[in-house]
């Protein structure tokens, strides 16, 4: 999977929206395929116009576990957005995930203003889902 730093660097070199759009699709193509068995209603992200599934894996410290995520979508551009979301959040501690401003990152790479309202809402739903998963893994 492409790292967030690499994604940010790559976006810095892409001036045209069409090039960025193609790059997002390419990121989605490089996303590992989620097993069919994981594409359940429980893993489906609510609030996305396209179908999106997220699976959370927790390891390590029970007080502040390391979370990794798998994601999938049936739409090419959304699959690319999933890849970026996973690059932002996957492999981080739950406490760190709760503090990340992913929408700010999407704004800095110039994607937010080019997303349709439906895609932007779906992106927010993915982020909320991941943050909720992280918050649920932390002690009250």
Swiss-Prot record:
Cystine residue pairs: none
A Pfam match: SufE
Cross-referenced InterPro entries: Fe-S_metab-assoc_dom
Coiled-coil residues: none
Protein family: Belongs to the SufE family.
Protein name from the UniProt record: Uncharacterized SufE-like protein R01000
Species of origin: Rhizobium meliloti (strain 1021) (Ensifer meliloti)
Upper lineage: Bacteria, Pseudomonadati, Pseudomonadota, Alphaproteobacteria, Hyphomicrobiales
